[in-house]
Amino acid sequence: MIDAIQSVGAFSNLKEAEGTSLTASTALSLPSAGASAPQSQSFAEVLGTMTTDAIRSMKSAEGVSLQAIRGEANTREVVDAVMNAEQSLQTALAIRDKVVTAYLEIARMQI
């Protein structure tokens, strides 16, 4: 179910064009104590990482739910996984709403 959502994502085309997959893990790196300049990421990379984490969270919740149906997971594990996935989804929706609002404001500007 989540794989279908992943193929529709806006970042799947971007990552495939760059030669990497959306499912590839891209973690945020913290600069080391001896580093002279902090390493920055582009906005697309940050959103891609957040999207990957949200998809991974939803897949995990789906897997735990299936384990519970088979009797291999208890209720607490299912609730924790589903709540984590719900929080990730709510964050993604909030970011989407902010991006759409910003786009609409830019579109209304007179040039």
From Swiss-Prot:
Keyword entries, A-Z: Bacterial flagellum
UniProt record similarity statement: Belongs to the FliE family.
Subcellular location: Bacterial flagellum basal body
Gene name, Swiss-Prot/TrEMBL: fliE
Record has Ribonucleoprotein as a keyword: no
Keyword DNA-binding on entry: no
Organism: Sinorhizobium fredii (strain NBRC 101917 / NGR234)
Protein name listed in UniProt: Flagellar hook-basal body complex protein FliE
Pfam family, one: FliE
GO molecular function terms attached to this record: cytoskeletal motor activity; structural molecule activity
PANTHER family, alphabetized: FLAGELLAR HOOK-BASAL BODY COMPLEX PROTEIN FLIE, PTHR34653
Cellular component, GO, one term: bacterial-type flagellum basal body
InterPro entries: FliE
BP term (GO), one: bacterial-type flagellum-dependent cell motility
